[in-house]
Swiss-Prot record:
Gene source species: Influenza A virus (strain A/Equine/Jillin/1/1989 H3N8)
Family of this protein: Belongs to the glycosyl hydrolase 34 family.
Keywords: Calcium, Disulfide bond, Glycoprotein, Glycosidase, Host cell membrane, Host membrane, Hydrolase, Membrane, Metal-binding, Signal-anchor, Transmembrane, Transmembrane helix, Virion
Post-translational modification: N-glycosylated.
Gene3D superfamilies: 2.120.10.10
EC number, as in UniProt: 3.2.1.18
Intravirion topological intervals: 1-14
Name of the featured protein: Neuraminidase
Enzyme class: hydrolase
Location of the region described as Hypervariable stalk region in the Swiss-Prot/TrEMBL record: 32-86
Residues binding substrate: R116, R150, E275, E276, R291, R368
Active site annotation, chain numbering: D149 (proton donor/acceptor), Y402 (nucleophile)
Length: 470
């Protein structure tokens, strides 16, 4: 066979293979259409079946691939329904990690806000982290001087829980240097306090729209909880303070429905001090554990009924939970009066468990470092010192800060009780470290029916940043 004949033969074989390959593709397409395109019961690809129930809607996405059914259950909350939140707090044995945002570590190279006062609140379908920004980013020149609490640049924003407070996912909520937020089952309500110290104003937003205001009544830094407010059967409650941080101030409970204030009452606590309350629903009432920045190292307790009647006193436990504080052995508890050294404090929390109490506190007695949570037997009703459980969340070699409470609603958790949860702020930068800025990240823990080992979920950012070296 001469060279020309070889070329013709190879070309003919190649052409034949190409034609055969094309025919195979055509046959494959025809078979696919015939198999997947048949009528009758098998023609349900990508159909959605919706079955309605009394309280919620369960959506079943049914996709059939060659006679194999894949069913995905998607929970859906009817947004026309208020959350109940009259259930009791679940009895828990420990607290497991729910989320950690690592905002400062990520912010060394990412577009993350400079923040303080982060807190968590939940709707029937999600939990969100709220935070007060400083109108600046980490590792940027505008972060200089952000140790200041109140400025016209501070805003309340939020992200899905676990996300760092970044510019790409954050949602604006209110102009604020003090704030609270909660969901009634229909929409989010946020309260942002802003303005000059002597004439501050709290703007109530409902569903993202301003609906009401509270003006400063004492002319001395109107402020609110820095943690979740509480909604029960459509009505939402929060606590505000106006007056000195180191002397007698004035305290009020507010009640709103769909973002409009429908009631308020003054709280009388002569010789005591209430601010930055951490509140949660329990057995149809609002229970708050607050900060006494004037007279004691035990925490004020405020229990609010739906009609705005209240009971006020102090956490009975014979262990102090504010910072700074004295030795546990030297502390005498009281259910009615402030006890301990008369110094400033830090925002904290507690949960009632029957007559017991879970109480969070820094490990250090003198500074905002470390964090632990203790269960004190009969500590809600008696001056007991008996610790039945203790769990370390941040070790004493690392900074902590504010802490506060929230609950997982039954609509979200699927339980028949409210899951107690808390968050711990971990402050970095000024005044304790050599930076030009102050910011924080947070760890969030939720109650479980198991004991959880001690560990340190600390912030972990390596400081200083580049901006601090200029």
């Amino acid at each position: 066979m001469n060279p020309n004949q070889k070329i013709i033969t190879i070309g003919s074989i190649s052409l034949g293979l190409v034609v055969f390959n094309v025919l195979l593709h055509v046959v494959s397409i025809i078979v696919t259409v015939l198999v997947l395109g048949r009528g009758g019961k098998n023609r349900i690809c990508n159909e959605t079946v919706v079955r309605e129930y009394n309280e919620t809607v369960r959506i079943e996405k049914v996709t059939q691939w060659h006679n194999t059914n894949v069913i995905e259950y998607v929970p859906y909350w009817n947004e026309g329904t208020y959350m109940n939140n009259t259930e009791a707090i679940c009895d828990v044995k420990g607290f497991a990690p729910f989320s950690k945002d690592n905002g400062i570590r990520i912010g060394s190279r990412g577009h993350v806000f400079v923040i303080r006062e982060p807190f968590v609140s939940c709707s029937p379908t999600e939990c969100r982290t709220f935070f007060l920004t400083q109108g600046s980013l980490l590792n940027d020149k505008h972060s200089n001087g952000t140790v200041k609490d109140r400025s016209p640049f501070r805003t309340l924003m939020s992200v899905e829980v676990g996300q760092p407070p970044n510019v790409y996912q954050a949602r604006f909520e209110a102009v604020a240097w003090s704030a609270t937020a909660c969901h009634d089952g229909k929409k989010w309500m946020t309260i942002g306090v802003t303005g000059p110290d002597s004439k501050a104003i709290a703007v109530v937003h409902y569903g993202g729209v301003p609906t009401d205001v509270v003006n400063s009544w004492a002319g001395d830094i109107l402020r609110t909880q820095e943690s979740s407010c509480t909604c029960i059967q459509g009505d939402c409650y929060w606590v505000m303070t106006d007056g000195p941080a180191n002397r007698q101030a004035q305290y009020r409970i507010y009640k709103a429905n769909q973002g409009r204030i429908v009631g308020q009452t003054d709280v009388s606590l002569d010789g005591g001090h209430i601010e930055e309350c951490s509140c949660y629903p329990n057995d149809g009432k609002v229970e708050c554990v607050c900060r006494d920045n004037w007279t004691g190292t035990n925490r004020p307790v405020l229990v609010i009924s739906p009609d705005l009647s209240y009971r006020v006193g102090y956490l009975c436990a014979g262990l102090p939970s504010d910072t700074p504080r004295g030795e546990d052995a030297q502390f005498i508890g009281s259910c009615t009066s402030p006890m301990g050294n008369k110094e400033y404090g830090v925002k904290g929390f507690g949960f009632r468990q029957g007559t017991d109490v879970w109480m969070g506190r820094t490990i250090s007695r003198t500074s905002r470092s470390g964090f632990e949570i203790l269960r004190v037997k009969n500590g809600w009703t008696q001056t007991s010192k008996e610790q039945v459980r203790k769990q370390v969340v941040v070790d004493n070699l690392n900074w902590s800060g504010y802490s506060g409470s929230f609950t997982l609603p039954v609509e979200l958790s699927g339980k028949d009780c409210l899951v107690p949860c808390f968050w711990v702020e971990m402050i970095r930068g000024k005044p304790e470290e050599k930076t030009i800025w102050t910011s924080s990240s947070s760890i969030v823990m939720c109650g479980v029916n198991y004991e959880v080992a001690d560990w340190s979920w600390h912030d972990g950012a390596i400081l200083p940043f580049d901006i601090d070296k200029m």
